[in-house]
Amino acid sequence: MEKSWFNKTSQEVEQELKTDCQNGLSSNQVQENMKKYGLNELQEKKKDSLLKKFLEQFKDFSIIVLIIAAIVSGVVGVAQGEGFTDTIIILIVVILNAVIGVAQESKAEKSLEALKKLSSHASKVIRNGKEQVIPARELVPGDLVIIETGDYIAADLRIIEAVNLKSQEASLTGESVPVEKITEKIDGNEIGIGDRKNMLFSSSLITYGRGKAIVVNTGMNTEVGKIAGMLDNAEKQETPLQQKLNDLGKTLGIACLAICAVIFVIGLLQGKEIIDMFMTAVSLAVAVIPEGLVAVSTIVLAIGVQKMVKKHAIVKKLPAVETLGSSTVICSDKTGTLTQNKMTVEKVFCDDELQDVKKVNTTEDFKKLVYNCMLCNDSRLLEDGQLAGDPTETALVDMAFKLDYEQSIYRENPRVEEVPFDSERKLMTTVNKKNGKYIVYTKGGVDELLKCCNSFLYKGEVRTSINNYAKWIRENNEKMAKDALRVLAFAYKELDHMPSKAEMKTIESDLTFIGMVGMIDPPRIEAKKAVEKCKKAGIKTVMITGDHKVTAVAIAKKLGILKDESEALTGTELEKMTDEELTKNVRKYSVYARVSPEHKVRIVKAWQENGEVVAMTGDGVNDSPALKTADIGCAMGKVGTEVAKEAADVILTDDNFATIVSAVEEGRRIYDNILKVIQFLLSCNVGEVIVLLLATLFAPQIGQWFGISDITMIQVLLPIHILWINLVTDTFPALALAFDPANKDIMDRKPVKRNEGIFTKGRTFRIIYQGLMIGLLTLSAYLIGLGTTHTAIDGLTLEQTKIEVGQTMAFIVLAFSELIHVFNIRDNKNSIFKTGILGNGVLILAILASALLMVVILFIPQLRTIFSIPILPSDNIIETIVLVLSPIVIVEIMKLFKVNTTRDE
């Protein structure tokens, strides 16, 4: 069972770890403990090799189908003496897809490495009775550590000496305010990390004071280490797009086998040769499977990734882009994600009224308050203009600077004496000299300070009998506390002489109360708009934080995340719920406060059990397991811990919650465009299948109508024609669809459900009827070619000439009608005359490039030979143009009568 150190006295810890609270460990003890516990390091998960990453790309069912098609094509090619041309083309596509996937993962890893800090931390310890500085990785349990302001804590420590010690633990607990530390033991066993005030934890920062502590846990045994261990056990689900494309691949694979089997049997019944029917079946297989779909989908995602970089998001894995677009719930950490992670003064009580700091009246009383904020303060201004020190104190100085108070105030009012803050008095006092006078400035908790005051400032006057006025002060204190503001009170008195040491002992008496300030880690300005945008888009925002409930609720109300406090739940309340109860009730809650890393994972899983696609944002170590469990984890790049970045799928380089919403919008655009690609490629492929099916089924009749005695010659398209169209002619326009801009209403519609497949009622209807349209147009071209050819070409019989002219017309009409058809795909509702054809310049270039490649094949003799294409007779050109332009006319008529879409679209 794991040891608890917070409920032991300093002496018990000292005895159990065999250390010395004065002299620390001996050299021999250090060596023994190093052997026993190892280095103070987190175990890094071994990164996959390039080969493993490459092989991972071949798991998709659609890729497996393509590989099988390549093998079959190779076998048939050898049997027919045509070589491996088809096989090589298919394998190039498969390998290209894998290379793109690996390249993106490697690129994201490099970007992540660039974000990592290169600094290595050191710790000051006492060993053998002497102080020494050692690398933090060499700390062992039992080490006696000296702690000072600004120190980074590199192991879990039990405090044995503390002088005004405060620690910033936001990255671990989510609490935005530094925690005051104590040395006394804490009774109880079930004490949350945030309430173990006699402990210091790895990854936290000392913001104030000094002390000594004993190392109790290192490496993977620290609280941070336990979280890192949870990451290895976190399950990662397939993204919605991966699931849908895999389902699509299986559907196409089954359809391919079924169609091939039917055609093979029909052909044999018609008396055709087995090898001929095998070739026809291969042609059908090639026609059914959209060879370019996987590569195009990958490239569409890669293009989306590049756009995301410009929007301050680094995507580690390609499918993550689309998952963002499918998100239905965003679970967000509060501190540093929804808030600025910077304490800021919001309210001021001065001149007898509670005022917004931005609208405060700059009276003489307020001036005294600001001087107190600046001078009774231990924060310091760095050379780069940044403030360093306790966040509460830096907030006070920041307020003064924003109100144009100058640094010269420090020079004109030098500090000559002080009484430091301590947790018992909850007060801090300085004595500052100005123009021969001595002014005592005191700040602290409201109740503690009022005990030291016998008068108060009231609109420029000093008034006595503070007791009645104290009620009004406390009422305003409560108002600020209800808004989750941290309140500090300020008082002063003037002396005509430098106080003696004896006088300093009672200096905090007979003070004049000036006023109070209320501060909070405020919401990001852009976060409220982002939350509103999420609501419009049908996405629920959930706040999950380690901070106190009152603070979380106040921030959530300001952001519009919750309306009523009943929507908030604490970690203690959550602990009492079973997983089943949480799954059943998870929709009731919008805010979770004082939760642990384990709780965050449970919340994410509960939403997933309800069929939601969950995005999780955060920056702390405490967010990491949930980041990995979520469908999409988004870590903050600037202040995010390395553990969080490793666990995430996306890293937001500007630490901005609004960026996640922009990323969702980009994800939706990409998903829409992938659906356009699928509809385009499948409708084209269905057209090819219909042509081959009809030609095979009605081969005897076609032979009879057009005087072709050998019906085995009747083949509308050769395998090389289909491959060329699928891999070259169609691929460029399909790729260009990736650049289609988002629809204006893209963030005004509900997210796509996780279980909604690609083949919705409307999309299935469009794929079938548009495929039928392309198939019949292509077959018509073939039949026209057969029927209008009356003269044999040199070296060919008339029958052979008819077949080649028919195939040429079919090839041209199929290729060019599909290029025209891509304009229909861009918008299923609105007419092309409304949307225009120039909205996507890349698409225009892609169509021109594909058309140019077709022209090259048609007019270069060597290529015509490879593709078995004769020169097209001039008297067939008019019919060809009419057939090529027909898809636009047909689909426009369907749109006009509103039958291109279903009611639910």
For the regions a language model picked out, list residue spans one by one.
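Conserved cytosolic headpiece of P-type ATPases
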Residues: 1-751, 756-759, 772, 811, ...
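Helix-coil boundary and interhelical linker segments in multi-pass alpha-helical membrane proteins
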Residues: 697-717, 784-806
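Generic alpha-helical transmembrane segments
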Residues: 729, 807-822
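Membrane-water interface at loop-to-transmembrane-helix junctions
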Residues: 755-772, 800-809
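Pore-domain transmembrane helices of cation channels
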Residues: 775-776
